[in-house]
Design a protein with these regions (language model features):
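Charge-rich amphipathic alpha-helical interaction elements
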Residues: 1-147
């Protein structure tokens, strides 16, 4: 029984470590999502709050149009990256939830096994105590008969 508990404890440590690793990965992924959101916001501000439209100069208008188009491509790319990062974060969240459940169920099994071991030990100790008490009682009975 003790070997089983030791094995369960080792498995519990592994599951606990897996939960911590997944928590760390999820936190990193959420930071990435936030960083991408800030990038998108900052790039959108560049497009929306750039210099006012220049009138008359075709080259300047062309440059400004090219600039806004490139910024918009970067925004679109960042949105795609954000969507992928969000999907990955959701996947990690699901994995973390599943791993947490496995870790918790193993913890409950381990607690039950420990309790069973304690109860078995207490029963053995009680049997020894009962045996010693019975011997004392028998000796007292024999001593009283001999008197």
């Amino acid at each position: 029984m003790s070997k089983l508990i030791h094995t369960l404890e080792q498995l519990h440590l592994l599951r606990n470590r897996a939960v911590k690793d997944l928590s760390s990965k999820l936190a990193t992924q959420q930071q990435l999502c936030q960083r991408l959101e800030k990038n998108i916001h900052a790039l959108s501000n560049l497009v929306n709050h750039s210099a006012p439209e220049i009138q008359g100069n075709a080259t300047m208008l062309n440059n400004q149009s090219f600039y806004k188009r490139n910024i918009q491509r970067v925004i679109d790319w960042q949105r795609q990256e954000q969507a992928l990062a969000t999907v990955e974060a959701q996947k990690l969240q699901g994995n973390l939830l599943a791993e947490s459940r496995r870790e918790k169920s193993l913890e409950l099994v381990l607690d039950v096994r420990r309790q069973d071991l304690r109860q078995a030990q207490e029963r053995r100790e009680q049997k020894v105590t009962d045996a010693v008490s019975a011997q004392c009682w028998l000796r007292q009975q024999q001593a009283q008969r001999q008197r």
